[in-house]
Amino acid sequence: MDFALLRRWYLQKGIWEREEILRLAPVAYACAGDMVGFKSSEHFGALQLDSNQEAYCWIHSPPVSIRLEGAFSEGEYVLRLKAGVGFLAKSPPYRVAVNVDGREVGEWNVETEGVLILEAKFNQSRPGKEIEVTVDGDWFRPAEFDPNNPDRRKLLAHFYWIAVL
């Protein structure tokens, strides 16, 4: 077990989720706090802290890709993504999709504001040391954000962490 990974995962989570973390160590993990595994940081904004002192960063435009390293064997895994969403002008629902190595493993219609933990199961058909997770959808925060311009008002999104259990 990678105790540094487990410690980072433990510190990143809220108090109510820590008991679960001690039971389920992640196979792979990336969070906004350290940007480990991010394929391209150009899609992510500066690191910020929310009211609970948890690190997040803005997602500028989909799709965003994160490379997760771990000891992946054949079998079933659970992917969890924690993200925050805030609506502007467009009425919900918003579509969010997650792909693992080019295969869609989950799709959600998000209808509520706030912080969400999305979960999807997927099968790993071949062993490997890394997977690439791509998050896509009809949400973004443009660089020249203007809440009064109807063409620019879409869903605001920020990224907390992603884990594979």
Language-model segments: which ranges?
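Glycan-recognition and processing domains
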Residues: 2-76, 84-91, 139-165
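Exposed beta-strand and adjacent loop surfaces of beta-rich binding modules
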Residues: 76-78, 93-95, 130
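Structural signature of nuclease core domains in nucleic-acid processing machines
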Residues: 78, 91, 110-112
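Short, surface-exposed beta-strand/strand-loop-strand elements in extracellular ectodomains
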Residues: 90-103
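Predominantly extracellular/lumenal beta-strand repeat domains
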Residues: 100, 110, 136-141
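Extracellular carbohydrate recognition and processing domains
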Residues: 105-127
